[in-house]
Amino acid sequence: MDSAIEISSGSDSDDEVPPQPVWPQTRTRMDPTWLSRRPLPTVDSHARAEHTNQAPPNGASSDTSRPGVSKPFTGNGNTVNSRISSGSGADYVRLSSEQALKRTLPPSFNSPPLPARSGTNNISNASGSRVGVDYERPLSQQALKRTLPPSFNPPPLPSRSGTNNIRNAGGSRFGADYSHPAVSAVGNKSTFGDHYSGAHAEIGIQRGVNGVRILPPSLTHGTSASVLHHAGSSDPMHRFGGGEDRNPDNDERLVYQAALQVLNQPMTESDLPPGTLSVPLMRHQKIALAWMFQKETSSFNCPGGILADDQGLGKTVSTIALILKQKIVSQLKSESSCKQETEALVLDADDESDNAKHESGSHVKPELKVSSNSETSVLSACGNDENDSSDMEKAEDEEANSSTRAFQWKRPAAGTLIVCPASVVRQWARELDEKVSEESKLSVLVYHGSNRTKDPNELAEYDVVVTTYAIVTNEAPNKFLVDEDENDEKNTDRYGLASGFSNNKKRKVVVGASKKSKRRGRKSTNDTSSEPDCGPLGKVGWFRIVLDEAQTIKNYRTQMARSCCTLRAKRRWCLSGTPIQNTIDDLYSYFRFLRYDPYAVYKSFYSTIKVPISRNSCQGYKKLQAVLRAIMLRRTKGTLLDGKPIINLPPKVVNLSQVDFSVAERSFYKKLEADSRSQFKAYADAGTLSQNYANILLLLLRLRQACDHPQLVKRYNSDPVGKVSEAAVRRLPREARSRLINRLESSSAICYECNEPPEKPVVTLCGHIFCYECVLEYITGDENTCPVPRCKQQLARDVVFSESSLRNCTSDDSGCSSSHDNGLDRSVFQKRDFCSSKIKAVLDILQSLSQPDSPNSAQHGQMPSSSRPYDDDDVTIVEPMRLHSSSPSQGAVKTIIFSQWTGMLDLVELRILESGIEFRRLDGTMSLAARDRAVKEFSKKPDVKVMLMSLKAGNLGLNMVAACHVILLDLWWNPTTEDQAIDRAHRIGQTRPVTVTRITIKDTVEDRILKLQEEKRTMVASAFGEEHGGSSATRLTVDDLKYLFMV
């Protein structure tokens, strides 16, 4: 039987211990190089060391001034001064002056036997047992017990007066809880805690090809011999926001090892048993399934990742396959564990068993076992990511952890939570139903609407729960960590740092309750409903959370992004075809959600990613590629697999159609542009650009809208809330009306939901500004609470007011008419027969598609760029037309028309009605049922030829392969949003070539937006190491990785 050395040492001063005999040469730990100078002997992994008890040489004595006390033992007869170090380098020598240290050391130190002494030590270390180190008690009152695994083959202790019964069962793990690193590795900056998280982890020692055991880097002075098994983020050091006291170099070494493993591993595929899915997996989806399953079950400290496949490549099906595979494996594991005799792992404060029960579908709580099967063993030990622990718990003192663990055990263990935009909730439900065979059906709950359940136990009964970001925002625990420097814009600008970063401030907890209420909350752990400001979603311990269209949380400062981070889960996934939309900062929000250390803390993210990019963009982007390689899988439609495209789709042709203004439109635009430029210069001269940022965005918004139609600038149809709003306004005191008007006219009038200047702006009774389309998502039954952090105002139509209704009622009370006018002279553009240049271009395209024999139709409806300006009188009403396909067997040609502004869709709708074209519409003002009905009718009814879509509501997740022509009426700041809209039609299932027409106006702000889009495309391509075609432009080599991580 393997044995472990147990060494007891007192903490008295060195003067109290008599000097050791001459034969052991005394060394102190003050010389950290002594161990590195001593070569480590090779350990035979197949031999059991058997030693006989030996007595020390004559003259050697172990007596001390106190019975049973000796100096710490190094394993070779040498003694060292005990020094306990925290992960941040704190010295606890004085704190440990009265404690006894018990340590077990590996046999590589070649320890001679201890001298005899009195006393009896009976130590039993069962397999997987952990040392009961209580860090809540003073160090002076406890003994630190540590047990090394039997793989170190320690020699037995010498005979002493008394007996030493030492048992260390095979397969034992490190007994110490290394989530509180107490002993630094001698001669190395790394600590045990940097490479082992102790709780729930298997031994991180690997066997080489020749059978020789490979020590971890902390014992080999930084030499990485293999990719270590690393447990999940169960310890506080790995918890959300807990990386600042650690050395990020140690975490980066793990990232390097993971990236190296990905680089060296051949591409593998995985499939489900026949009959599990109703559709076969494509090869690239099999590769995605193998990669995702490996990411969840590997020992890397980030159980999950980012699936960043291009839109339309089947990320949804790959995710469904992952859910099914985990369920199948859990069922097999549960069945095999009942037949095999294994030793249970002691999982500290972990509900993995409950989650395994849920995944397997069994009502009997299976006991987690260590199986001889390698895959099953990994499944049992990994994934205990203890991401269950909320950010609040990271900041609480250790005394509260015991009650927190009790609280965790009360949480219902649920399956997979899928968070997605409201527009694709129904589609996820359909995919989960249609893509899974009858024999393998998953139980699915659409958690949406005002009548949804309030019982978290009911959520735990389903395999999959589908909900929206809005509901998560309101039901997630209302407590989170924030950077104090996030609002410290002046300091970051002053020192040349990016907004949201500070190099000397630490994270703090922002909680609505006071310290007293937090203390009361700790005691109230008997009921899951006792957690304050938390809905059912926040009271469940999820096995897996999947964020679909994860770019929704790209702004890490938003309440939505924070809420997703505070949910408890074992595995975490981000699905996004466009993970970077604006800046590299978009990635930080994903890293924080995924608990991807060390980049989950903004300070580390800034110093290790953003700073290198700013200093040397080429090397900086290569470093970013390596960081992403460990957690991200990305394939585009142009990616090659064995020399062939991963998917065969019809071609996509993108045409840029530049038209010109009419005379009246050009005159209007020039005056608006001159006024805007003059206003901007005034801000610049006064040095108030930053204070007037919202006003500057509004100036740009008006210029962009003028390119679509002048009436948009004049606030066409500017009172969206109508008579209900006016009736509610009349009940408000006059002072309240004035206050709300001032809020709408404020320079900070930015929509709280989309962070853009509001279209059809409205103000709520609580004083918050929204686009009408954005706030309607909350009014129409999804979640009627104001989404602004810590605002609990219930939203309804009678508490949302437009500017016109506020002013009209105010002017009526004063007995005078309102002097406020919505715009400039309306005489030209209010004519019913006026048609803007862009709308004319749209009608021309539809006209060409209605004539199958025309040249334009032969080119899939391509419309040549217009260079002739339209005159005011050049207005034609298009005769009623029917859209036909050049190939009768393919059916009618269907078109999607996108615009950012619902006002523009209103104007286009009027002209399409006059032309007699059957159409449907989808925007954010519609209920989910109405949206779903519009999509079905557009896809199924041959007579419906056109779909009008707002970019906000229609660019995410929808499957619109019935259309083969896409028209973009206006440009968005980042091109990825447009790409997402286009890929609603160009995706798996499309059988015809897709033509895209982007309509712009010459010599306007849109020319400059096009240039900005190209710059952003270049930035995204650099971050992913891709050329514009999607192929890899810069292949990282092993030498690249070593250089980037300074290994």
From Swiss-Prot:
EC number: 3.6.4.-
Low complexity bias: start-end ranges: 1-11
Residue stretches making up the Helicase C-terminal domain: 887-1042
Zinc finger (RING-type): 751-790
Span of domain Helicase ATP-binding: 296-597
InterPro entries per UniProt: Helicase_ATP-bd, Helicase_C-like, P-loop_NTPase, SNF2-like_sf, SNF2/RAD54-like_C, SNF2_N, SNF2_RAD54_helicase_TF, Znf_C3HC4_RING-type
Biased composition regions of type Acidic residues, renumbered to the chain: 385-400
SUPFAM superfamilies with a match to the protein in the record: P-loop containing nucleoside triphosphate hydrolases (SSF52540), RING/U-box (SSF57850)
Record-stated family: Belongs to the SNF2/RAD54 helicase family. RAD16 subfamily.
Summary of subunit composition and partner proteins: Interacts with SUVR2. Interacts with itself.
GO biological process: gene silencing by siRNA-directed DNA methylation
Biased composition (Basic and acidic residues): 354-368
Keywords per UniProt: ATP-binding, Chromatin regulator, DNA-binding, Helicase, Hydrolase, Metal-binding, Nucleotide-binding, Nucleus, RNA-mediated gene silencing, Transcription, Transcription regulation, Zinc, Zinc-finger
Compartmental location: Nucleus
Keyword ATP-binding: yes
Protein name per the record: Helicase-like transcription factor CHR27
Main EC class the enzyme belongs to: hydrolase
Region of interest (Disordered), ranges: 1-89, 103-130, 145-174, 349-407, 511-533, 851-873
Annotated Polar residues bias: 52-88, 118-128, 370-379, 851-868
Job description of the protein: Probable helicase-like transcription factor involved in transcriptional gene silencing. Associates with SUVR2 and contributes to transcriptional gene silencing at RNA-directed DNA methylation (RdDM) target loci but also at RdDM-independent target loci. May be involved in nucleosome positioning to form ordered nucleosome arrays on chromatin. Associates with SUVR2 and functions redundantly with FRG2. Required for the efficient methylation of a broad range of RdDM target loci.
